[in-house]
A protein has these predicted regions:
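Asp-based phosphoryl-transfer active-site loop
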Residues: 2-17
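A short alpha-helix capping/helix-coil boundary motif
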Residues: 5-8, 28-30, 70-72, 140-143
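Conserved residues at the C-terminal ends of beta-strands
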Residues: 8, 65, 153
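Active-site phosphate-binding/coordination module
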Residues: 17, 21-122
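Conserved acidic, metal-coordinating active-site core of Asp-based
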Residues: 101-163
């Protein structure tokens, strides 16, 4: 008998349309009724994971940002492993725009998702299923935060590889 089940989101709990199927919803409900603990683990940030949890119709603990942050079923942060400031500062000091004018930096800080440029058009065109978007802040504000995950986004794969 299983004591717990941990599931990823994309391609596991969520189908190709990034939705929870009725079968998945019923399966998770059955696990919980049997007393089996259920957890969601994902590379997404808290808000992205919570959106999927809400669609499932359950309240379960969330492990986010590739395991660097965990939240209880009520959304309280219970664990966080931020990037070390010395390494974070080195990455944030990179002149990433010199690798490609369309490259942007983005990061997860606690339950928040921050970017330094407006991405509404990107999400509207490329990820129309998303209902939650990152908060835009200035590069100066970005450098003041602690992050559990930072990453670069861009259209040109070769530019990102060079970076």
């Amino acid at each position: 008998m299983f004591k717990a089940v941990v599931s990823d989101l994309d391609g596991t709990l969520l189908n190709a349309e990034h939705k929870v199927s009725e079968f998945t919803r019923e399966t998770v409900e059955l696990l919980l009724k049997k007393g089996i603990k259920f957890y969601i683990a994902t590379g997404r940030n808290y808000l992205g994971a919570k959106e999927a949890m809400d669609e499932l119709g359950v309240k379960v603990p969330l492990i986010t940002s590739h395991g660097s942050v965990a939240f209880d079923e009520n959304g309280n942060e219970i664990f966080s492993n931020n990037l070390k400031r010395e390494y974070l500062d080195k990455v944030l000091d990179i002149d990433y725009k010199s690798f490609g004018k369309d490259i942007i930096i983005t990061g997860y800080s606690g339950p928040n998702w921050f970017v330094t440029e407006d991405l509404r058009e990107y999400f509207y065109n490329k990820k129309p299923d998303r209902t939650r978007y990152p908060k835009q802040i200035t590069p100066e504000e970005f450098k003041k935060h602690n992050f559990t995950k930072i990453f670069f986004l861009g259209e040109d794969h070769d530019e990102l590889l060079e970076l």
